[in-house]
Each structure stands twice: as C-alpha cells, then as structure tokens.
Regions:
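Catalytic-core regions of core metabolic enzymes
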Residues: 1-290
C-alpha cells in the first residue's frame, strides 16, 4: 500500500503548457506516472505532450477522471488554482509554487479544511511513491521502492535522505515533501500519521527545520500513538541566528522553542532517534531497522 499517490492515481497538471509545467510533466510521464491531462485556461481542446488540455479542472475531472493534481501556477494565481481543484473534487492536490502570499494561503486553508481533500505544499518538491508515481520535481532515479517513509520540509534533504536509505540497502515507500512555507496543507504530524498507518512502511525519516511547532506537534503525537514504528529525525538550521528567515519563508527562529536545539530535544524526549548531521540519516535508519 502506498500513501497519497500510486500507479492508479489519475494525475493532471495545472499550468500544463507553461515552461515549468511542461518540463516537469514530461519528466513525470517519462517516470511512468499516470498523467491523464493538464489544465491551461483558454487552451482547452489542444494536445500537449500527447495528453489532452482542458480549460478547467472540473472538465478534467469529468472527462479524464482526474483525482490528483499538481500545480505549477504563478504565485498570484496559485491560491485560486488550489481552490479550483478542491472545488472540482480532486482528492490530492500538490502545489509546487513558491511565493504564494500568506494572506492567500489563510483563505485556501480555511476553504480546503471544509472539503474532503488533501493539500501537500505549497513550496514543496511533491510526493513520490517509487516505481509507481512521481508527482513533483524530485529526481526520480534516486528513489527505489522499499519500506522507509520520508516526511520533509526540505526538498534537497528529502533527496539526500532517500539516497542514503537506498545505499543502506533499504528503499522508500512514499516520500512526502510538505513544504517550507508558514502555512501549508499537510503538517508534519499529518504526514507522519499517514505513514504510521501504512502497512508497508516500517520506519520513518522526519526532516524538519527551525521555525514553527510542526516537528514538536509530530513528536508528541508519535509518543502518544505508542511509538509504533521507529522514527529518525533531523532538524536543519542548527547555526541559524534568531529573527532571520533562512531559505524558506517559514524557517525563522521567533522564540526559544523554534530553535533547532529545542526541537531536537523535544524529538528525543518523545522517542525519536535524532541525528545531528544529515550525513548520519542512513546509518541511523539501518540501526533502527536492524
């Protein structure tokens, strides 16, 4: 069983004919992902990358049976694109776009919380279930099928963790890049919970960073849930100065609990196997699965 996306997912690309959408959609198709079409308003009826183009998400749902969407739409229009997908009945919405105004995301979050759908992102690398579906911008060749789930705020650290896990002789069930913005659809805790409840996932790598309380919330849930599966944790930003945004919009130390040190302490107190360097992730996974 996989989480969020699999070989049966029927995926559409919003912003399909733009340069980003075109490049990444073609990579997804080459990977073997079941892309059933795309959406670009005003270009409906055309064909692009051998797939149909629709004017609206609703049309893509009606005609192609789409149930999953990936969004490559400019920041000013991305919030509307997310809400359009949700309203059309798309079940899994993955938004890659970086730079969506926070005020827009407040509205999006309130809207999608009323509907039966899952938003991953924005400002994320996407989701991959190796050898089944790559719905994102990650380099697919790094990921091999296996039994370790990954939840990460960082795109590049997701790839690094996957590479190490694979080199240790294990593989990945599903990797979820949740994104680094202050307001995101799927939280660390929610993503970890999905993997905890996945039969094929035997261990989880959880990668966080400074800013916010998502990792602490996840760690407390992991303990309350009975530490059913081993979780390896890493927090990026251990040398970050307070009050300065570091890379991601959400990566800013506001209070004492936002620091990497404070988060690592909370993780360890709740039974997470914390590593101090990303270079140690693979070794720790091998240790907890031995």
């Amino acid at each position: 069983m996989s989480v969020l996306v699999n070989k049966d997912s029927k995926i559409i690309v919003q912003g399909f004919t733009g340069s980003e959408g075109t490049f990444h959609a073609s990579q997804m198709i080459d990977y073997g992902t079941n892309v059933v079409g795309g959406v670009t308003p005003g270009k409906g009826g055309q064909e692009h990358l051998g797939k149909p183009v629709f004017n609206t998400v609703d049309e893509a749902v009606q005609k192609a049976g789409a149930d999953t969407s990936i969004i490559f739409v400019p920041p000013a229009f991305a919030a509307d694109a997310i809400m359009e997908a949700a309203e059309a009945g798309i079940k899994v919405i993955i938004c890659i776009t970086e730079g969506i105004p926070t005020a827009d995301m407040v509205k999006v979050k309130a809207y999608i919380d009323q509907l039966d759908c899952t938003l991953v992102g924005p400002n994320c690398p996407g989701v991959i279930t190796p050898e089944e579906a790559k719905v994102g911008i990650m380099p697919g060749f790094i990921f091999k099928k296996g039994k370790v789930g990954i939840v990460s705020k960082s795109g590049t650290l997701t790839y690094e963790a996957a590479d190490q896990v694979v080199k240790q002789g294990y593989g990945i069930t599903t990797a979820i890049g949740i994104g680094g913005d202050p307001i995101i659809g799927t939280t660390t805790k929610e993503a970890v919970e999905l993997l905890m409840n996945d039969d094929e996932t035997e261990a989880i790598v959880m990668i966080g960073e400074i800013g916010g309380n998502l990792e602490a919330e996840a760690a407390r849930w992991i303990k309350a849930d009975g530490n059913r599966k081993p979780v390896v944790g890493f927090i990026a930003g251990q040398t970050a100065p307070a009050g300065r945004t570091m890379g991601h919009a959400g990566a800013i130390v506001g209070g004492a609990d936002d620091t990497a040190q404070a988060k690592m302490k909370i993780l360890a107190e709740n039974g997470v196997h914390v590593v101090e360097s990303p270079a140690k992730i693979g070794e720790m996974v091998a240790k907890v699965l031995a």
